Every structure is written in structure tokens, then in C-alpha cells.
Amino acid sequence: LQTGALDQWGNIAVGADLIRRLDGDIVHGLTTPLITTANGEKFGKSEGNAIWLDSTLCSPYKFYQFWLNSDDSVIGNYLRVFTEISREEIEDLEDSTIREPHKRRAQVALAKYMTQFVHGDSELQTALAVSAAVFGTADPRGLSPAAVSQMADTLPSAKLDTTGYDLAPNLVKVGLAKSNNEARRLIGDNAITVNGIGVKDPYAKLEMRDQLGGIGWLVRRGRKTLGFIRS
């Protein structure tokens, strides 16, 4: 018996026919439906959307975010395929997706389950801590060096411009401003935070003692635009 995804049916059929011709034996093939994205695309390296189990290729935080970003239209199928969550709970999560899609309860349940299953509870807690820091619901200064490293690897980043350690040119380097003047204007408008702390001085400098995990600084423009300046 040879098994494979639905797109391998042709190869399986050819193999079965070859064995029949060469040995006279009857063999069998079994295919399963492809697991696809909301756009109907399959997962894979060639499609550019592969998700890795190896933490050196995909950090637990990035792994967690992958599942958290699952589309509403496929979340029920993913829960049934990838988890051992009970039917009743899955149906409840699907109902929640319809009634309160903004809460993303189903996506959170899937992301937690998969991250804990693959990487363990400790890395799940790290992924949750990084998520809270990135989305502004927790103080990033409490992150461990390992958590900071995972966060830095998933954000736009730039090497520290050490010419005076001024914040403004570093905001330009990391893509949060187009020019030093714009960067200083944003700071003056209270639109910039460093490590979760608002900055008011347009000529503020980055202090080495304020680095997160000895790695660098988390900078944010507004609520959703982030970057990481590496020391």
C-alpha cells in the first residue's frame, strides 16, 4: 500500500501499474485530500509558504504566528486535521468564529495547541510573551534574551548607526521614517516608543544600557509599525 496526497495520485497509479507488469502483483494506493490555504494553494517550499518544525528554521514565535494567522474559512478544517481537540469544542470554536470573529478564539486555540505540541510548553510561553510585547499588551523589557532574539528575527531590523547614537537616523535605517526630519517630527508628535516607552525628545539617543536582552532596541511607530535596531 502506497499512500500520498491527492496530487500524487498519478505517481501512485504509475507505480502500481509498473509493479503489476514486472511482478504480476496487485498493489494498492490511498490518497488523502490536500491541506490548502484559504486561496486553495498547497503548502510547500516551492509555494513559499512552508512551515518548518525545526526551530532553527522557524522560531516558536513565528510558528505560533503562522497558525494564529489562519483564515476563518479554513480554521475548522485545520483544527480537525492537526489537533485532537474534541468535536464539541471545535464546533464551539467555529460558532465563535461566526459570532465573534474579532476574538479569533479558534486561531488562538490552534496556535497554542500546535506550538505546545511541537515545541513544548516553555517555548509556547515564550511565543505568547513575544506576541504580547509585539502587540503592545506587555512590557518588552521583561523578555528573556532568547525571546528577544526570536522577536528581532521576525521584525524589520537594522544595524545600529553609532554616529552619536541618535534615535532619529536609526529610525530611518529601520524604515520607520523617510528622513531624519520626519523621524524627529514623529518623536515630537509622541508617535515613537523605544522598548515600550514613549520618547519626547527629538534628539534623543539610544542608550546601550537599555538594550533588550543585550541585543538591541524595539522601536514602534504608532500602534502597528515596528522595527528592531541591533547593537
Enumerate the language-model features and the residues they cover.
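Conserved nucleotide- and phosphate/pyrophosphate-binding catalytic cores
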Residues: 21-231
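NTP-dependent nucleotidyl-transfer catalytic core
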Residues: 1-8, 16, 23-28, 41
